[in-house]
């Protein structure tokens, strides 16, 4: 629990990522190097008579390590498809008497990927994110368990950071067993006596010694330590001879060797707190006293003292492993492998003797490739290292603040039950109860709440105001950060409660209760404290069902950046904070003078003196700034049409002009998904809730062609095509422009920048060698004379696929070898070519659009604007939604947003509405919206904006006939998003394609060039209509009747009648499966 005195409790959203990696660089590396240093081994082949002469010592100077300057900046790594990394240099001291070695050399341990200031890692030109992992905290846990008959017993388990696990559990007879890993159970008295306790000491330490009687009947209850060790080993390993030395070594390696077992600092604190140990031992390994205390607590639970039981899903028992800790774990794994390599090479004297000199011996000892392979494996294939979601800035910041229960050491999604996926009361203010994926990962992957901060131990903390008991008012001069452990013993009220009430809803010990204001200890900050960033961006959230709010949170992250961004008329106030923390917008850090602005960079001058208030900005001219030595010149490089991981466009748009002054905090440049420094994911458009000729049935959406022609929902997408040459068995492939349709290719055979290309155009010309079909003496003679010129070749140029067109944005070539042909002066090159194609996608039928309240739909038709329904003012609607999609889904918040947007458009102002405004009174949202609708009516003198008989509704006219519709229609300006699920990326057709080898049915999916499959429900529909012949065709010659479909294909070519269908392949598979079950099934033809 920490007291903070600052103006805002809203943290920087990326501090947890950056602070964790900074701790690893400054402290974590040194800790691991100290842990493994020194490495002392013995050379087995030494001829020295004294054993001490055969030792070789390798020590790491942990305090003197340093990093080399990265080869690329983050921007250069993205552009050149490189990795933003730095070499870790560690001074290594090697001492060996018999090798005459005593020297220190700097060793490049590994190339460590570095985190950028925005919390990402750049590998091979692609930004990646390491997701926070939430796991069980190391420590000791007591919990009940039930057998098949429903008998309740108890179990105490030690959970370590790494190493073996130990459990004490009782059976239905009351016997207490010790369980080590997956070995056999042994009576707990045998285990404790093997640790050195006498039976009198064990009994004297227990509150209920009589509860141990069933256990004492199992074995001889008085044993010496050696006898207990022998009995323990004979029980655990019945097939091996038991010795005291082997038993002591086993126990030491399992629980007392710091190299193999550790509770970690957090686990040791938890054990000491749980057992209330007076000694407060700081050993990170297990101690015999820990095991004895665990037995005492287990027996106390068996005798009814259930207050010691732990709730494993409580956040006080779970902690977050951040990026720095996860990388430190991999660094420890790599050093462990390096240690084994050094041991093995020390024992082999021949390796050391082969390499003369001190440096040669050092290089033969230390092979740092093992460290490189560990990091490559972690960043490339670990479940927690993911491609960053760059669809928009909200998706990026949400990805960096994600919490996952999956991954190494975590849960398995296939075995996770409903309890662990559910919402625990301790989540309040720490983990968002709304935002989670739909599907298998529901409840296992979550998002950190908006105000949550993560402390150094990995526990999630939420800020609260301290309630002053004398005045019953919160102390707003500072706030306390409470973890779930400290919050358990306090009485906490939400931030939107009325303190003047006699009974106030509160939380205490994970229970929701009511207390008086005198009994409350802490008060929440604001109503959005328990929500994630994406959820807190939904206005009028309190009027939405939680399931729809979940969809709205997720779909905001899927919104593509539009060609023309626009701020929402109705926001919540967090839009600007999101973009600044993620670096989407460029903000002035101090008062500056802008000297030059273009699409690539912004040049500015900043004062170098300490007190900037002494500068007279009003009377300073440009000449004064340039000539003065009080100002320093700086340059900000802007991102210009850069491809993201999701093929969307990353682009900065300058907001400032040259020769102007800006203040600290001013927004200098916008992102593609921001407007005036605020998050802008969609557009405010005029919609109406009404049915229209069935075109908006269910979740279909009817739109106006204005949205297409005015580029309202037009987005820019950048695709990357990679073409490489390879050395085949027949020869080397190469790039060339000597191919067909080469009008757009340059001298290297690569398409020119700025070219407009369409489907079928050649992007990269390439020639591949072909195997010779003839092997006669003449061909061999020609090859012997002219070399490879006479070989057969074929054109394997890369052509643009169907359905794609656009302009070539950039071309990057990495040529390995170039040769010039003397005859036609063409250049033949080998290597790799990367072609970037930019395309502008307008809204079309099949695209997915959505609001912020989970209201989503597919564009079903694009109407001419003259046919769209229009208002009394003559303005045509832009979109028509189905009104039946509101009541059943219970997301009424979209109606409030729609009507308030109408008032905002009329009054030419934007609204910031925090969720849960009902704290100010009943029906506050309705009254707020009606007030501004009435105000807009008075301002414009248009009575249709607010009618008392039908507030929020208006008479709408049919654009085709000019007649008004029978009922008033709700119209307004909600914020509509265009989602990344575009029809151009999903539509697919095929004439022929691959089939499954087993069922001979078409494969599924666009990526596999799959086809349609007739499922059960489709068959039922055809059966209902009695379409027997159509059904027979679809199940045989059009599906998996191999012989029949080949005959049908030939008959269509020859123009003859279709043949009779045969037996489908899937039916033959069914017969084979039945035969595999020893059910012989034969097929016979019966002629009627």
Swiss-Prot record:
GO terms for biological process: DNA-templated transcription. Signal peptide: none annotated. This is DNA-directed RNA polymerase subunit beta. DNA-dependent RNA polymerase catalyzes the transcription of DNA into RNA using the four ribonucleoside triphosphates as substrates. Its main location: plastid. Belongs to the RNA polymerase beta chain family. One of its GO terms (cellular component) is chloroplast. It comes from the Eukaryota. GO terms for molecular function: DNA binding; DNA-directed RNA polymerase activity; ribonucleoside binding. InterPro entries: DNA-dir_RNA_pol_bsu_ext_1_sf, DNA-dir_RNA_pol_su2, DNA-dir_RNAP_su2_dom, DNA-dir_RNAP_su2_hyb_sf, RNA_pol_bsu_bac, RNA_pol_bsu_CS, RNA_pol_bsu_protrusion, RNA_pol_Rpb2_2. It is found in: Plastid, Chloroplast. Keywords: Chloroplast, DNA-directed RNA polymerase, Nucleotidyltransferase, Plastid, Transcription, Transferase. Pfam families: RNA_pol_Rpb2_1, RNA_pol_Rpb2_2, RNA_pol_Rpb2_3, RNA_pol_Rpb2_6, RNA_pol_Rpb2_7. In plastids the minimal PEP RNA polymerase catalytic core is composed of four subunits: alpha, beta, beta', and beta''. When a (nuclear-encoded) sigma factor is associated with the core the holoenzyme is formed, which can initiate transcription. Its EC number is 2.7.7.6. Transmembrane segments: none annotated. It catalyses: RNA(n) + a ribonucleoside 5'-triphosphate = RNA(n+1) + diphosphate.
């Amino acid at each position: 629990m920490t007291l903070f005195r600052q103006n805002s409790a809203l943290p920087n959203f990326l501090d947890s990522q950056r602070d964790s990696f900074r701790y690893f660089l400054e402290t974590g590396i040194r800790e691991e190097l100290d842990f493994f240093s020194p490495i002392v081994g013995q050379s087995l082949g030494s001829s020295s008579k004294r054993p001490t002469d055969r030792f070789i010592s390798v020590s790491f100077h942990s305090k003197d390590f340093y990093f080399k300057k990265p080869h690329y900046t983050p921007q250069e790594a993205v552009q050149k498809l490189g990795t933003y990394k730095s070499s870790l240099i560690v001074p290594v001291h090697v001492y060996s008497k018999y090798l005459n070695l005593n020297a220190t050399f700097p060793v490049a341990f590994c190339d460590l990927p570095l985190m950028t200031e925005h919390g990402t890692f750049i590998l091979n030109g692609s930004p990646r994110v390491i997701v926070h992992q939430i796991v069980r905290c190391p420590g000791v846990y007591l919990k009940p368990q039930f057998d098949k008959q429903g008998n309740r017993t108890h179990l105490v388990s030690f959970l370590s950071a790494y190493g073996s696990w130990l459990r004490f559990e009782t059976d239905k007879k009351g016997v207490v067993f010790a369980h080590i890993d997956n070995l056999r159970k042994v009576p707990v008295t045998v285990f404790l006596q093997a640790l050195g306790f006498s039976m009198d000491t064990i009994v004297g330490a227990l509150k209920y010694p009589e509860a141990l009687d069933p256990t004492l009947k199992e074995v001889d209850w008085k044993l010496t330590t050696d006898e207990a060790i022998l009995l323990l080993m004979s029980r655990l390993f019945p097939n091996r001879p038991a010795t005291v030395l082997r038993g002591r070594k086993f126990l030491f390696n399992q629980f007392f060797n710091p190299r193999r077992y550790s509770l970690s600092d957090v686990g040791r604190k938890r054990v000491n707190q749980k057992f209330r140990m007076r000694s407060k031992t700081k050993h990170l390994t297990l101690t015999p006293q820990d095991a004895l205390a665990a037995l005492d607590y287990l027996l106390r639970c068996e005798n009814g003292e259930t207050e010691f039981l732990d709730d494993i899903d409580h956040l006080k028992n779970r902690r977050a492993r951040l990026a720095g800790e996860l990388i430190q774990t991999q660094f420890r794994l790599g050093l462990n492998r390096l240690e084994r390599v050094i041991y093995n090479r020390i024992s082999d004297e021949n390796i050391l003797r082969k390499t003369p000199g001190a440096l040669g011996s050092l290089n033969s000892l230390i092979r740092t490739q093992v460290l490189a392979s560990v990091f490559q494996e972690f960043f490339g294939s670990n479940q927690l290292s993911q491609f960053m979601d760059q669809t928009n800035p909200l998706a990026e910041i949400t990805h960096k603040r994600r919490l996952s229960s999956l991954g190494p050491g975590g849960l398995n999604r296939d075995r996770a039950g409903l309890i662990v996926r559910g919402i625990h009361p301790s989540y309040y203010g720490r983990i968002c109860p709304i935002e989670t994926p739909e599907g298998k990962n529901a409840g296992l992957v979550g998002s950190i709440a908006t105000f949550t901060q993560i402390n150094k131990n990995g526990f999630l903390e939420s800020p609260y105001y301290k309630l002053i008991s004398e005045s019953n008012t919160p102390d707003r001069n500072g706030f306390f950060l409470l973890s779930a452990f400290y919050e358990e013993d306090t009485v906490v009220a939400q931030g939107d409660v009325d303190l003047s009430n006699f009974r106030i809803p509160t939380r205490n010990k994970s229970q929701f209760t009511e207390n008086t204001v005198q009994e409350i200890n802490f008060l929440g900050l604001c109503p959005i404290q328990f929500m994630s960033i994406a959820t807190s961006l939904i206005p009028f959230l309190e009027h939405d069902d939680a399931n729809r709010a979940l969809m709205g949170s997720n779909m905001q992250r899927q919104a593509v950046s539009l060609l023309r961004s626009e701020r929402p008329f109705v926001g919540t106030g967090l839009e600007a904070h999101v973009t600044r923390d993620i670096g989407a917008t460029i903000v002035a850090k101090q008062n500056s003078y802008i000297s030059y602005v273009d699409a690539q960079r912004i040049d500015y001058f900043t004062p170098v003196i300490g007190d900037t208030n002494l500068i007279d900005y009003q009377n300073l001219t440009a000449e004064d700034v340039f000539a003065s030595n009080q100002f320093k010149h700086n340059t900000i490089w802007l991102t210009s049409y850069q491809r993201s991981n999701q093929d969307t466009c990353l682009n900065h748009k300058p907001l400032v002009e040259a020769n102007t002054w800006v203040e600290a905090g001013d927004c200098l440049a916008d992102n593609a998904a921001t407007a005036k420094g605020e998050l802008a994911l969609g557009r405010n458009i005029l919609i109406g809730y009404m049915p229209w000729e069935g075109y908006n049935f269910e979740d279909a959406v009817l739109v106006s062609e204005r949205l297409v022609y005015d580029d309202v929902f037009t987005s820019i997408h950048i695709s990357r095509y990679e073409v490489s040459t390879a050395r085949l068995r027949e020869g080397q492939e190469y790039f060339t422009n000597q191919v067909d349709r080469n009008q757009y290719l340059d001298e290297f055979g690569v398409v020119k920048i700025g070219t407009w290309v369409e489907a079928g155009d050649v992007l990269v010309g390439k020639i591949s060698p072909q195997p010779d079909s003839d092997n006669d003496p003449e061909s061999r003679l020609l090859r012997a004379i002219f070399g490879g010129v006479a070989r057969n070749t074929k054109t394997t140029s890369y052509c643009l696929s169907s359905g794609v067109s656009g302009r070539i944005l950039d071309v990057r070539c990495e040529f390995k070898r170039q040769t010039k042909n003397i005859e036609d002066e063409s250049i033949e090159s080998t290597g790799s070519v990367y072609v970037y194609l930019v395309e502008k996608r307008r809204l079309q039928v099949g695209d997915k659009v959505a609001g912020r309240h989970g209201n989503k739909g597919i564009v079903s038709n694009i109407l001419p604007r003259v046919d769209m329904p229009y208002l009394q003012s003559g303005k045509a609607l832009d979109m028509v939604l189905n009104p039946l999609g509101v009541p059943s889904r219970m997301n009424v918040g979209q109606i409030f947003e729609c009507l308030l947007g109408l008032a905002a458009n009329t009054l030419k102002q934007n609204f910031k509405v925090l969720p849960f405004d009902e704290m100010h009174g009943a029906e506050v949202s309705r009254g707020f919206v009606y007030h501004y609708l009435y105000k807009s009516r008075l301002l414009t003198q248009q009575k249709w904006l607010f009618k008392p008989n039908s507030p929020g509704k208006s008479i709408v006219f049919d654009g085709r006939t000019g007649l008004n519709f029978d009922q008033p229609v709700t119209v307004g300006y909600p914020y509509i998003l265009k989602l990344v699920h575009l029809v151009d990326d999903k539509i697919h057709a095929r004439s022929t394609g691959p089939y499954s080898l087993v069922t001979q049915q078409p494969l599924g999916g666009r990526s596999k060039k799959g086809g349609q499959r007739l499922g059960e429900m489709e068959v039922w529909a055809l059966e209902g209509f009695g379409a027997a012949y159509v059904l027979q065709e679809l199940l045989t010659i059009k599906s998996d009747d191999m012989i029949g479909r080949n005959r049908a294909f030939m008959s269509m070519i020859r123009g003859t009648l279709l043949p009779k269908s045969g037996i489908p392949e899937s039916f033959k598979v069914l017969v084979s499966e039945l035969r595999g079950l020893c059910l012989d099934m034969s097929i016979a033809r019966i002629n009627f």
